[in-house]
């Protein structure tokens, strides 16, 4: 079986940024979060060379940092006071159609913020033709690896879920998507789905493969 990790061909292509419009003031702690991400990721988190990345909202399509605050009860002290958490979603850079994001978490029970590492399946699959439009068999999971960069990520404050959706090329026919839910101070992988096939939809080929779903 040929092992082909999901490729993100446009992640490192230079791209012009859209107009950011009015940006929020940079909050306390954002500079420290940036420093952690840059130190760990180097050129993969060059933030498109911007000296100061603005704080932006959904209207800016992710070309900036975002901040979320919430409180949770840790397992080690469920009856005690809640732990305050600040989640920094950092714009690390962009390509032609993908945005790279890193996430840094600061909690009131920890002295320093931490760069979040996300569990991701290591996939094994093989194409059945030169067009890469179908597989020889259903994909398998070799195991799991950790990544500190997600693509086109978003955070759902209600469910406390980070979701990523990476397009493997511009038209988006091949892609991968993951969900990570916040539980007891960490983000846990709960679902991973991908479509490694290219070209027009084929009724004989599955639309996508859910290769991991927690509890199943």
Task: Describe the role of every protein-language-model region.
Residues 116-184, 188-216:
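Short aromatic loop motif centered on NTY/YTY
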Residues 80-91, 100-103, 157-165:
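Acidic/hydrophobic-patterned starts of short beta strands in beta-sheet-rich repeat architectures
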Residues 21-83:
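Terminal domain-start segments
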């Amino acid at each position: 079986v040929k092992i082909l990790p999901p490729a993100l061909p446009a992640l490192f292509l230079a791209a012009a940024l859209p107009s950011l419009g009015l940006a929020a003031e940079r909050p306390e702690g954002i500079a420290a979060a940036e420093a952690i991400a840059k130190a760990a990721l180097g050129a993969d988190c060059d933030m498109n060379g911007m000296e100061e990345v603005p704080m932006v909202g959904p209207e800016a399509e992710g070309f900036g940092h975002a901040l979320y605050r919430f409180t949770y009860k840790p397992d080690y002290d469920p009856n005690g006071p809640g732990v305050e958490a600040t989640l920094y979603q950092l714009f690390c850079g962009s390509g032609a159609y993908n945005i790279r994001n890193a996430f840094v978490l600061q909690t009131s029970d920890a002295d320093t913020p931490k760069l979040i590492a996300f569990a991701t399946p290591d996939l094994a699959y093989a194409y059945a033709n030169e067009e890469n439009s179908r597989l020889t068999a259903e994909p398998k999971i070799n195991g799991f690896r950790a990544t500190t960069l997600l693509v086109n990520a978003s955070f759902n404050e209600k469910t406390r879920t980070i979701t990523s959706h990476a397009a493997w090329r511009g038209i988006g026919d091949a892609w991968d998507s993951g969900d990570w839910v916040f539980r007891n101070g960490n983000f846990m992988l709960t679902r991973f789905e991908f479509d490694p096939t290219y070209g027009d939809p084929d009724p004989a080929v599955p639309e996508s493969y859910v290769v991991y779903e927690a509890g199943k």
